[in-house]
Amino acid sequence: MSGKNLRFYVALYMSKLARTALRVLKRNASYFPGKLAIKICPDFLGRINKPETIITVTGTNGKTTVCNMILDALEANGYDVLNNKAGSNINAGVASSLVAESTMSGKCRKKIAIFEIDERSSKLIYPYIKPTYAVCTNLFRDSIHRNANPEFIFNIINSSLPESSHMILNADDLISCNLGAANDKTYFAIDRLATDKEESVNLINDVRICPKCHKPLHYNYVRYHHIGNAKCEFCGYESPKADYLGKLDMDNQILNVVTPSGTEEYHMVSNSIFNTYNQLTAITVLRKLGLSYEAVKKSFADLNIVE
């Protein structure tokens, strides 16, 4: 959607006025200005100008950490990045971020943005925000009253995603790796670990049958829950091949990443497998954005995450 009508300009001016008032009062202006803009102009997100390059990050776990890693690395390399780090990850928060960095005519001041996106808000955001790169970290069960089953969230995201977006997905997650059948994709994964099991030992595993033919799915190995590597012995469905494959050297705290251009060595920011996935996600995004191996490596050299 394009074009700025009178309703849009009223929404923009009122939201900027609200933002100024909140800041004068030393209040958080990361939610209400956007909420007001969308209340006045329901398709506000579709009409306001956006940066040339947009990265969105959604998923059950790790999206905030991944966003912060990407943002820190980009800023360390001289990028001026629009983001919603300070506030809400729903549509009003994204709108507030765009209002804050727009001129009075609705023109965006920045050329690149990274937005953390709440999974359930995908249907309110993706129809208007067309990300260059759409990242999904993983999909797991969450609080039952909010997100219910991961398939429910999968369907919300999958039905909302623009086909033009290049997806960056976890090949080890047998739910989220199936997002965006028509989209271009880049996959990341972590190679088999000594601690992986031959079969699931968790009480919860939401992928026990093949998502294609619905017959029993064979796991080559299971890391936890439905994270692992699998192949269907009936229809041939299998875990996607990783474009960025992490090989962990836990003794020396090194993350070796096998990429399309060769193997790269990074300092592991954490002993936790969860944060190693987060780091690998960020590395994949940054390399796809065009940052050099040396620049990305330097960004993680002195970073440590407190467990």
Language model: regions and residue ranges:
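Phosphate-binding loop of NTP-binding sites
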Residues: 2-212
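Short amphipathic alpha-helical segments and their helix-coil junctions
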Residues: 12-21, 253-268
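Acidic-glycine-rich active-site phosphate/pyrophosphate-binding loop
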Residues: 64-76, 247-263
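A short glycine/serine-rich beta->alpha loop
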Residues: 80-85, 265-273
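Cys/His-rich short segments
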Residues: 191-254, 269
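Short glycine/threonine-rich catalytic loop with a Thr-x-Gly-x-Asp
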Residues: 202-205, 270-281, 306-307
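Gly/charged, well-structured mid-domain segments that form the phosphate/adenylate-handling core
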Residues: 237, 248-252, 259, 285-307
